[in-house]
């Protein structure tokens, strides 16, 4: 193929920033002009010399914007001309390993990768979604695109997956680091069923909004509130810009029939404890096994939070963690313990409402002796009188001092000062006389609860009476100066642990230690002599002075033991420390829940952790492949009647697919398989807003809507025509066999931020400009980017110095022109040059919905919202997007308040030299400054006092 003829004069179509970006990111060192880069690439992807020459003409005239992989093709030895891949993680060992390997390979070849996640939640065969996503998060940094920039991975999960709440928040900078994946992008596949439920709730009334979360493997169902889930999605989008939204049923509904007939579907645009573990809930403490499948409220260290308990596995290896307060927990090696590194960190906890959520988490298998667990508050449970036992004080006393006769009847022998407690005891019968040793023998009611039963979940009154009885029987008061505590000893460790749980339900922490091991002791033999006896190990339960004070605040008192409640000056409780971790060899079923706020729950009295635009079908045998490029609508009037333009672009993309199929390494066979069977391309656009501004048409107008529909109607018609032409010349792929088509799918509106800069700062994709002037940083320095059409207007009306001063004003106002005087810009022109954040986003949705019917794949639609948007409006926009038939939503861009509303008046005044601006304009700008000052004043009156000056979307105080 002979060389392409280039036209160096076309370098003038680039601005300085576009040239810098091309040279820094795309051009080879020996290339001195962008024309050489265009010619080289067009030669690689052209069918013959004439086709290549025409492609060069299109690109050099800025009619056609080549995708990054095509534009950089040849610069990296291993790069391939494919922009996007969609993969699917099959829930098998092979699927997990193979997909990870393939995705890393695809990233290194220069493409962005979307990954559908079909992994089950945590069980004995899977550690759940988030642990795998952590691996992908690390790989996105390790395996760079073309060895230059970090990989771009977007993970997609169905909104009925049990791990959806953790998945939604994985890009939040705070919270459990084990679920943070800040280097990944993420999207949610949202079903029609869910949106229909949200729409139903939208009408108000008492609607049952129960939403089933279904494990993709076990099909086990848990539930959440649909409204709560929807609110979490929208709030997270406001805070982080993500997750992307894919209305999955809309995507599948609009697949071509020939794809549906093949059964293809679109799937994307372990912290567990043993069954007997006691969980602190709002209703009491219960074995986690008994709570399986139930929605309950658990204590997370600060408050009660709704969760669903699930069985996470069978025959899982368990470790036993022993702690200094006598508590033990049998859990999986990965179960998270919440650790405090230092006393300094512990002090910060007192003033940090998010201390638990933000604290360090350590796997059980990685715990070391003397590691300190975080302190936490305990609630006082009022309990349930249905669980009360009869004669609570008497039963408590019986547990300490009572025995059974040989006939199995409960009895007490009172001695010393305990005889004075007779009036408090429920006695069935008694001797009336003391025996030879001075004891008073009594027999208790036959319906007394069994000895060592502890009424953990009874009413608070019942628990206090029972505890008073037990401590009066076996307890002792220890005094250290004015500091008093109560200790009680017993040979039955499990019994003391149940008392420890009872105290937890009363808001009190306690400690159990071993008083002594089993030993031989010489004791009186009852016959006047002594002899050796075998003594069992003895354990001691310790209630501190702060614990006693807390009990006294609830009305607790003992009859025999005398102590004075003293309010502690500070939380002097010692930190609970790790003693050791035992590998017991135990294998058992496991259970857990996902607590959404602190990611924590109280287990056996211990607070620990708990457990877009390319829409193509994927499965275990295929990774979808799409080759992209965009048509520049800014030059639409130049190319719309060129009969070869669309055909040449489609032929070029087909050639790029062939290059991929022939040169792809065998390690990405699923992607090659998909490319062969589908041959899907994605023709998109950029420059839509520039096209409107060029014609002085407002984005928010019926005229813009008419042009939008007209453009995409004609594009769809031409693309369909040339799809059949190329099909007749080159044949149809397997999936489209019998249709005459060359490509299964042909259109996708992708984001084009970088391409827009290269194309002379045209507007990106189909979205509005974010600002009419802004600074852009590159490797070569900082550049002031100005709207070209606005610049032309200003140059016709002002001199150079005045223009510079007006640009300063625009920059100071966040790129807006709305504050400029009407004798400089008319009201119509101000409408035309509205920025993305000033445009009513209903128009963004309308234009997207109008063109969606002509686009067989999807669009990357960004929303631009003020941070103080009412949550009702936020909800309505997203609901309307679904109802309007949009397939996907991309980023939600939220303008910073500091830039949007609170503009510094002094900075504005210093930016403008009034002496050199025409008097009429000068006076008008002064007025606009006063308006901004008033705006600032009004804003300050509305500042939320609860968020340190930040307005919080969704905050009732702010609304």
UniProtKB/Swiss-Prot annotation:
Chemical reaction(s) catalysed: a 2'-deoxyribonucleoside 5'-diphosphate + [thioredoxin]-disulfide + H2O = a ribonucleoside 5'-diphosphate + [thioredoxin]-dithiol
CDD domains in UniProt: Hint
Domain of life, per lineage: Viruses
Domain annotation DOD-type homing endonuclease: ranges: 378-508
Coiled coil start-end: none
Calcium recorded as keyword: no
GO biological process: deoxyribonucleotide biosynthetic process; intein-mediated protein splicing
Annotated disulfide bonds: 84-626
UniProt site (Allosteric effector binding): 91, 120
Any single Pfam family the record assigns to this protein: LAGLIDADG_3
Residue positions of the active site: 270 (proton acceptor), 611 (cysteine radical intermediate), 613 (proton acceptor)
Molecular-function GO terms, alphabetical: ATP binding; endonuclease activity; ribonucleoside-diphosphate reductase activity, thioredoxin disulfide as acceptor
InterPro entries named among the record's database cross-references: Hint_dom_C (IPR003586), Hint_dom_N (IPR003587), Hint_dom_sf (IPR036844), Homing_endonucl (IPR027434), INTEIN (IPR006142), Intein_endonuc_central (IPR004042), Intein_N (IPR006141), LAGLIDADG_dom (IPR004860)
Record keyword Oxidoreductase present: yes
Documented EC number(s): 1.17.4.1
Top EC category: oxidoreductase
Functional description taken from the UniProt entry: Ribonucleoside-diphosphate reductase holoenzyme provides the precursors necessary for viral DNA synthesis. Allows virus growth in non-dividing cells. Catalyzes the biosynthesis of deoxyribonucleotides from the corresponding ribonucleotides.
Entries under NCBIfam families matching the protein: intein_Nterm
Family statement drawn from the similarity comment of this UniProt entry: Belongs to the ribonucleoside diphosphate reductase large chain family.
Descriptive protein name: Ribonucleoside-diphosphate reductase large subunit
The species this protein was found in: Invertebrate iridescent virus 6
């Amino acid at each position: 193929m002979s060389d392409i003829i280039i036209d160096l004069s076309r370098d003038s179509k680039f601005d300085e920033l576009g040239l810098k970006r091309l040279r820094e990111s795309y051009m080879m060192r020996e290339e001195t002009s962008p024309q050489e880069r265009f010619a080289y690439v067009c030669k690689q992807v052209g069918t013959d010399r004439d086709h290549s020459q025409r492609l060069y003409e299109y690109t050099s005239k800025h009619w056609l914007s080549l995708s990054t992989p095509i534009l950089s093709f040849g610069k990296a030895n291993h790069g391939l001309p494919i922009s996007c891949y969609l993969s699917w993680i099959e829930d098998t060992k092979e699927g997990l390993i193979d997909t990870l390997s393939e995705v890393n390979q695809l990233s290194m070849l220069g493409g962005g990768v979307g990954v559908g996640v079909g992994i089950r939640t945590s069980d004995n065969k899977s550690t759940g979604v988030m642990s795998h996503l952590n691996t992908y998060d690390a790989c996105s940094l390790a395996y760079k695109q073309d060895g230059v920039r970090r990989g771009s991975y977007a993970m997609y999960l169905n909104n009925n997956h049990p791990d959806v709440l953790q998945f939604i928040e994985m890009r939040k900078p705070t919270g459990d680091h084990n679920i943070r994946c800040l280097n990944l992008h993420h999207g949610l596949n949202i079903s029609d069923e869910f949106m229909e439920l949200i729409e139903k709730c939208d009408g108000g009334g008492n609607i049952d909004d129960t939403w089933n979360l279904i494990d993709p493997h076990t099909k086990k169902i848990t539930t959440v509130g649909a409204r709560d889930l929807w609110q979490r999605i929208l709030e997270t989008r406001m805070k982080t810009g993500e997750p992307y939204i894919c209305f999955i049923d809309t995507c599948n509904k609009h697949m071509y029939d020939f794809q549906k007939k093949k059964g293809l579907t679109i799937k994307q645009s372990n912290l567990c404890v043993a069954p007997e573990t006691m969980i602190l809930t709002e209703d009491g403490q219960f074995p986690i096994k008994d709570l399986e499948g139930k929605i309950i409220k658990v204590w997370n260290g600060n408050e009660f939070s709704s969760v669903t308990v699930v069985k996470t596995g069978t025959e899982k290896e368990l470790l036993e963690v022993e702690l200094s307060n006598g508590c033990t927990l049998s859990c999986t090696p990965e179960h998270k313990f919440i650790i405090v590194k230092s006393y300094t960190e512990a002090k910060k906890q007192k003033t940090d409402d998010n201390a638990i959520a933000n604290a360090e988490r350590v796997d059980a298998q990685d715990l070391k002796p003397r590691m300190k667990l975080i302190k936490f508050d305990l609630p006082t449970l009022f309990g349930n009188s249905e669980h009360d036992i009869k004669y609570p004080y008497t039963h408590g006393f019986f547990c300490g001092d009572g025995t059974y006769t040989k006939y199995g009847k409960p009895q007490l022998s009172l001695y010393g000062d305990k005889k004075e407690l007779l009036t408090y005891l429920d006695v069935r019968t008694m001797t009336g006389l003391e025996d030879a040793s001075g004891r008073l023998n009594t027999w208790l009611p036959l319906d007394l609860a069994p000895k060592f039963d502890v009424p953990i979940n009874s009413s608070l009154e019942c628990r206090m009476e029972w505890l008073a009885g037990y401590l009066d029987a076996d307890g002792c008061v220890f005094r250290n100066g004015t500091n008093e505590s109560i200790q009680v000893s017993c040979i039955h460790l499990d019994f003391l642990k149940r008392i420890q749980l009872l105290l937890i339900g009363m808001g009190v922490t306690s400690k159990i230690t071993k008083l002594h091991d089993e030993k031989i002791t010489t004791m009186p033999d009852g016959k006047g002599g002594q002899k050796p006896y075998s003594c069992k190990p003895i354990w001691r339960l310790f209630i501190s002075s702060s614990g006693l004070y807390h009990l006294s605040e609830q009305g607790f008192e003992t009859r025999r033991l005398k102590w004075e409640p003293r309010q502690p000056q500070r939380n002097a409780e010692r930190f609970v420390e790790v003693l050791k971790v035992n590998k017991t060899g135990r294998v058992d079923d496991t259970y857990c829940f996902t607590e959404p706020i602190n990611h924590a729950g109280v287990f056996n009295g211990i607070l620990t952790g708990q457990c877009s635009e390319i829409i193509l079908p994927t499965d275990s045998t295929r990774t979808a492949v799409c080759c992209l490029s965009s048509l520049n609508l800014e030059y639409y009037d130049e190319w719309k009647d060129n009969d070869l333009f669309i055909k040449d672009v489609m032929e070029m993309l087909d050639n790029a697919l062939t290059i991929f199929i022939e040169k792809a390494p065998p390690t990405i066979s699923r992607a090659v398989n998909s490319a062969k069977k589908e041959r899907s391309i994605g023709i998109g656009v950029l420059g839509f807003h520039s096209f409107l501004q060029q014609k002085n048409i407002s984005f928010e107008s019926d005229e813009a809507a008419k042009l939008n529909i007209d453009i995409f109607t004609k594009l769809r018609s031409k693309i369909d025509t040339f799809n059949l032409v190329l099909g007749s010349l080159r044949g149809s792929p397997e999936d489209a066999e019998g249709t005459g088509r060359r490509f299964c799918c042909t259109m996708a509106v992708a984001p084009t931020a970088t391409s827009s800069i290269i194309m002379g700062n045209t507007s990106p994709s189909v979205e509005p400009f974010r600002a009419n002037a802004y600074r852009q940083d590159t490797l070569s320095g900082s550049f002031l980017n100005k709207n070209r059409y606005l610049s032309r207007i200003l140059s016709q009306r002002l001199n150079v110095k005045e223009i510079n001063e007006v640009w300063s004003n625009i920059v100071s106002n966040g790129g807006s022109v709305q504050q400029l005087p009407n004798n400089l810009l008319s009201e119509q022109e101000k409408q035309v040059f509205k920025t993305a954040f000033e445009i009513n986003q209903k128009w963004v949705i309308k234009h997207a919905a109008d063109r969606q019917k002509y686009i067989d794949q999807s669009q990357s639609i960004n929303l631009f919202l003020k941070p103080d948007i009412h949550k009702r409006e936020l909800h309505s926009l997203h609901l309307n997007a679904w109802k309007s038939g949009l397939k996907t939503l991309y980023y939600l861009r939220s303008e910073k308040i500091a830039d949007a509303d609170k503009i510094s008046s002094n900075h504005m005044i210093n930016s403008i030299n009034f002496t050199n601006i025409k008097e009429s304009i000068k006076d008008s700008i002064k007025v606009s400054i006063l308006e901004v000052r008033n705006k600032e004043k009004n804003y300050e009156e509305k500042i939320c006092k609860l968020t340190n000056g930040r307005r919080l979307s969704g905050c009732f105080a702010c609304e």
